[in-house]
Design a protein with these regions (language model features):
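A short alpha-helical cap/connector motif
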Residues: 1-87, 91-150
Length: 150
């Protein structure tokens, strides 16, 4: 299976997310089918960081030793009380993504993800929630997105 996680996604994430961190962090990704984003994040976060990779399936992928793989639904995973960021690229169903965003914004101020075209309505719904002031960063050269509470 080929990945749609492209060099443009990687550049966008380095420039707008990962460059903010120079000390160890705790972060997570949801969805690791090909392992492409897993390998990318694991090599672009500071040394001694904690990186969780959550998926409902145990995909046969090669990942570095600094990755903690978790076989679980993202909504059922007992995540740490605090994350520096989470990257969503698992179930793209609108209601599921809305629930994921709500869940993870309780433990982080940065939720990001992939396939913005597939999850656009979920992003629109969250962005329209005036109870929580957020900014949404998109780039028309990639499919990744970043939502921050400000």
């Amino acid at each position: 299976m080929t990945s749609s996680f492209t060099d443009n996604d990687k550049q966008f994430l380095v420039r707008n997310l990962l460059s903010r961190y120079d000390k160890p962090i705790v972060c997570a990704e949801v969805g690791n089918m090909t392992g492409n984003s897993t390998r990318f994040f694991s090599t672009h976060i500071p040394n001694d960081s904690v990186f969780y990779s959550i998926d409902i399936r145990d995909h046969d992928i090669e990942v570095p030793d600094n990755v903690t793989r978790v076989k679980s639904c993202s909504l059922e995973w007992d995540c740490p009380e605090s994350l520096d960021f989470v990257y969503l690229d698992g179930n793209h169903d609108t209601s599921h993504v809305i629930k994921e965003i709500d869940k993870y914004l309780r433990v982080t101020d940065t939720v990001s993800g992939h396939d913005c075209g597939h999850v656009a309505y979920a992003l629109y719904r969250q962005f329209g929630n005036k109870d929580r002031h957020t900014e949404l960063l998109l780039d028309n050269q990639c499919s990744s997105w970043i939502m921050r509470v400000i």
